[in-house]
């Protein structure tokens, strides 16, 4: 057979594969009339540790509370909260975690991992095909968005895909590689090409929604900002509850403390988008100050790849009136530790400038004010001198600590603002903003996108 014959044959086979898959699965994709009164079903997918994906857990909880059956998919790891584990409408599907047990070179392992992830995701989604909705976290973008697009085109065309944008995946890759690197450019193209055709795009800030229009050319009518809000278990503690926390963790986190101590809390995953040198240098300034300042107990929760580096830096500081403790907490204990603090700290430096730190939302839920490193979108959450203080660099952070702990009126003022924030709960926001997208309730006023400058003349997406 001539060479061009082989070429034509291969092209025909390549094009025939999705057509065959479509024909084979189309009959399973149609909803019989007898199923009209059945509960709606939503797949909630995150290619990450379920227990460390609070926003997706909150989505699953809200959907189940509204009567949806939920297939919750992600890695096994940290334990989700009990209302997820004990809910009969939520079924958890663990995605196998792929580890480099054979010590392969980074590039080789990365390629094999992505290939394996494609197969695992397609197999799982094929098993769950026919759902009414598929709610997906982004990032990670690769291979999630490509697989989801394939699923929606060929395996379950009736499913409405909702992407929940927590950040831009390509900007996270750009923390390790130059923005001009071919891999970063490919990741940006991949994210826009496969992510741009969802039924609806949720995003964590208004600024991110505007960037999605500008960067990826998305239709503004399909972008719905959903600010993170504290879930039900993040709430202010009474004075007696705070004393219970201090007593329960006296041997580990609150040892050798006096009544004069002020407690600062921060949480982290010890990754490059958080610069802990800012906090450590700020604490050093506080420690060296000549002012009459109270001693500090700084509690840092979490774990991650850069933790050993952080602990080594703490050892070298030799602070006198500042002491630091670290801990990895159970899900139920985390809100209690937050609620017992006088002040929260966020060191999150957004890779894109458009996302918001979930830890600040959690802290506000517990009614504690926050000092946060400033960046573009932060003002949508932290209002300086109202519910916290936004700072640039360690000098401003150190001076803020000194100002707040030497002037009770300033600390009390932002404490009041944080207590007001604690009343804005996830449940209230979700039902009003997102519920109608899943046929839960209806918009009683304007559509959510009409609150923002997202209008666009571009045509709507396919699905």
UniProtKB/Swiss-Prot annotation:
Which is one Gene Ontology cellular component term of this protein?
endoplasmic reticulum
- PANTHER family according to UniProt: BETA1,4 MANNOSYLTRANSFERASE, CHITOBIOSYLDIPHOSPHODOLICHOL BETA-MANNOSYLTRANSFERASE
What's this protein's function?
Answer: Participates in the formation of the lipid-linked precursor oligosaccharide for N-glycosylation. Involved in assembling the dolichol-pyrophosphate-GlcNAc(2)-Man(5) intermediate on the cytoplasmic surface of the ER.
Supply one GO BP term: protein glycosylation
Q: Which organism is it from?
A: Yarrowia lipolytica (strain CLIB 122 / E 150)
Intramembrane positions: 106-126
Which pathway does UniProt place it in? Protein modification; protein glycosylation
Q: What's the encoding gene here?
A: ALG1
Per its record, how is this protein called by name? Chitobiosyldiphosphodolichol beta-mannosyltransferase
List the subcellular locations: Endoplasmic reticulum membrane
Family listed: Belongs to the glycosyltransferase group 1 family.
Which controlled-vocabulary keywords does the entry list? Endoplasmic reticulum, Glycosyltransferase, Membrane, Transferase, Transmembrane, Transmembrane helix
- Which ranges sit in the Lumenal compartment? 1-3, 127-463
């Amino acid at each position: 057979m001539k060479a061009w014959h082989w070429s034509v044959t291969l092209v025909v086979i390549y094009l025939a594969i999705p057509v065959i898959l479509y024909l084979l699965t189309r009959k399973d994709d149609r909803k019989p009339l007898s199923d009209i009164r059945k509960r709606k079903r939503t797949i909630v997918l995150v290619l990450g540790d379920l227990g460390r994906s609070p926003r997706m857990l909150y989505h699953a909880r809200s959907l189940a509370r509204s009567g949806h059956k939920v297939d919750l998919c992600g890695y096994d790891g940290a334990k989700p909260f009990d209302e997820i584990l004990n809910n009969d409408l939520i079924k958890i599907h663990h995605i196998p975690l792929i580890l480099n047990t054979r010590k392969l070179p980074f590039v080789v392992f990365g390629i094999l991992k992505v290939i394996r992830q494609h197969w695992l995701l397609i197999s799982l989604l094929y098993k769950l095909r026919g759902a009414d909705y598929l709610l997906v976290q982004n990032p990670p973008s690769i291979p999630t968005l490509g697989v989801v697009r394939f699923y929606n085109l060929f395996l379950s065309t009736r499913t409405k895909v909702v992407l929940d944008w927590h950040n831009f995946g390509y900007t996270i890759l750009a923390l390790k590689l130059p923005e001009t690197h071919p891999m970063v450019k490919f990741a940006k193209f991949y994210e826009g090409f496969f992510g741009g055709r969802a039924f609806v795009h949720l995003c964590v800030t208004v600024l991110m929604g505007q960037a999605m229009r500008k960067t990826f050319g998305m239709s503004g009518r399909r972008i719905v900002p959903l600010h993170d809000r504290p879930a039900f278990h993040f709430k202010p503690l009474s004075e007696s509850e705070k004393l219970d926390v201090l007593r329960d963790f006296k041997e580990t986190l609150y040892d050798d403390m006096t009544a004069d101590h002020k407690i600062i809390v921060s949480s982290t995953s010890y990754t490059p988008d958080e610069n802990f040198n800012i906090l450590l240098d700020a604490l050093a300034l506080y420690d060296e100050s000549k002012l009459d300042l109270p001693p500090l107990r700084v509690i840092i929760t979490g774990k991650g790849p850069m933790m050993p580096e952080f602990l080594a830096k703490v050892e070298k500081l030799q602070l006198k009136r500042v002491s630091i403790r670290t801990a990895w907490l159970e899900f139920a204990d985390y809100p209690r530790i937050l609620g017992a603090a006088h002040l929260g700290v966020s060191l999150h430096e957004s890779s894109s400038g458009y996302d918001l730190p979930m830890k600040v939302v959690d802290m506000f839920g517990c009614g504690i004010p926050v000092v946060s490193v400033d960046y573009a979108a932060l003002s949508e959450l932290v209002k300086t001198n109202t519910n916290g203080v936004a700072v640039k660099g360690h000098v401003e952070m150190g001076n803020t600590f000194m100002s707040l702990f030497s002037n009770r009126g300033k600390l009390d003022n932002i404490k009041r603002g944080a207590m007001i924030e604690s009343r804005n709960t996830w449940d209230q926001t979700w039902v009003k903003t997102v519920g109608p997208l899943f046929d839960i309730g209806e918009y009683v006023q304007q559509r959510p996108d009409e609150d923002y400058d997202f209008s666009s003349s571009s045509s709507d997406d396919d699905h």
